């Protein structure tokens, strides 16, 4: 299935000059959602994944069903103040500023094999921060998997030697 046929493009959102990739049309379509999950699983199934890590919020949409299909656990990555237990944090740079993300300190055990699943690879800043969190917790980042990659933003270049896959690619 061509997933691009299920992703709506909205020009001028959230501001002029942006061509927004709206995944709500894909996840609202049973065949499209199933196909995207199946594609992630097909890529990751032989990588001996212990945990799927997903950044909020759209990483949850894809990460949980992929974890289920692989028989792996799921670790949510949240903004500060959203997790009730003891956390570890990472600050990461955005195009215009910085942000922070957290996971529970005990959510990843030393040596666990981790795939990070998210909806979008743009500049790579968010996923680079998530990978640092995983490694700080003792996990091994085995793969970074995205529904969409905006290739002109060169996020893949920022991610060095990590194994990166994207199910669809767009020029911006």
Curated annotation (Swiss-Prot):
Subcellular localization: Cytoplasm
Gene Ontology cellular component terms for the protein in this record: cytoplasm
Classification via Pfam families: Pribosyltran (PF00156)
One GO MF term: AMP binding
Main location as per UniProt: cytoplasm
Subunit comment: Homodimer.
Stated role: Catalyzes a salvage reaction resulting in the formation of AMP, that is energically less costly than de novo synthesis.
Record's protein name: Adenine phosphoribosyltransferase
Organism, as annotated: Clostridium botulinum (strain Alaska E43 / Type E3)
Gene expressing this chain: apt
């Amino acid at each position: 299935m061509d997933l691009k046929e299920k992703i709506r493009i909205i020009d001028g959102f959230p501001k002029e000059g942006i061509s927004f990739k709206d995944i709500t049309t894909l996840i609202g379509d049973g065949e499209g959602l199933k196909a995207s999950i199946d594609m992630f699983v097909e890529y990751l199934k032989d990588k001996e994944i212990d945990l799927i890590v997903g950044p909020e919020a759209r990483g949850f949409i894809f990460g949980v069903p992929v974890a289920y299909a692989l028989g792996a656990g799921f670790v949510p990555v949240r903004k500060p103040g959203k997790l009730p237990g003891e956390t570890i944090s990472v600050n990461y740079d955005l195009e215009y500023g910085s942000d922070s993300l957290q996971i529970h300190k005990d959510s990843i055990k030393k040596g666990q094999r981790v795939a990070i699943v998210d909806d979008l690879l743009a500049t790579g800043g968010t996923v680079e921060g998530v990978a640092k969190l995983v490694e700080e917790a003792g996990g091994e980042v085995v793969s970074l998997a995205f529904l969409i990659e905006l290739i002109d933003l060169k996020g893949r270049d920022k991610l060095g030697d990590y194994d990166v896959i994207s199910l669809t690619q767009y020029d911006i």
